[in-house]
Every structure is written in structure tokens, then in C-alpha cells.
Amino acid sequence: MDKFPSVLLVTKTTGYQARSFGDAAAKLGVRLIFATDRCDHLEDPWRDHAIPVRFHDESYSVRTIFNELKRTPPAGVLAVGDRPMHLAASVTQVFGLQGNTVEAVGISRNKLATRQALKAAELPVPWFRAVSVDSDIVTL
């Protein structure tokens, strides 16, 4: 078992924010593990020891992450971006960690669904109504 807790960061290789997370993790004494959409045919092209994932193939990616981390599971999972967020929710579920559910992530990616969920939970939400893109703007 590692001396320091680890956190999995699911992100795109092009995400500039990843380095900021790395700096923060180092300051906190947390081992940051990357899961990125880097090329899985080259040997660690970014030299970050990232687990290669495919955002378009979630079941493959969840399996890959699980197989890589099952001996020393992460203490938490973070995500940067829409597609990484969905994968992170699935990984969180597989490891039995607390975090956003896949359903909640799906809702958060849709403004109407988000507002409906907030309203159903009796939380403050601005007035809204759903309209078709074909609606006559004058009659609205």
C-alpha cells in the first residue's frame, strides 16, 4: 500500500488544467494518477504514467482503469471536462467511492434536465419552460 493517498484524475491530454492539479496534489502530499485519452500504442508519450482511456468506449476504459488500480484503488476520482466527467462517475461507482452518479452527470450536461431536477428538489431555480427550436419566437 502506498504511503500517500492517491486520486485519479480523468482528463484529456490537451487539458492545460491537469498540470495545476498535479501541482496542488504535490503540495497536499497526494499521489495523482492520470487517466487520459493519450495514444495507447506508444509507451508513455507524455511521461506522466497516464492510464490510456477512450472516452468513446466507456466499458473498455472502466475495465482498463479497474485492472490498473485494483490492487491500490484511489481514495477519490476527479474529472476535468464533460466526457471525462461521465467516465469518472462510472469509475467512482466501480470502486465503491462517493461521488457523482452516472445519472447525475447525465442530468448536469443538459440545462433543461438540470433545472427540472433542481426544481423537483425544491431548490431555487430561475423561471423556465421548454420550447421547440421550431417555435415561433413572436408567440413565445
For each predicted feature, which ranges?
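ATP-binding N-terminal substructure of ATP-dependent carboxylate-amine bond-forming enzymes
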Residues: M1-A104, S132-S135
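Active-site nucleotide/adenylate-binding loops and adjacent lid/helix of ATP-dependent enzymes
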Residues: N110-L140
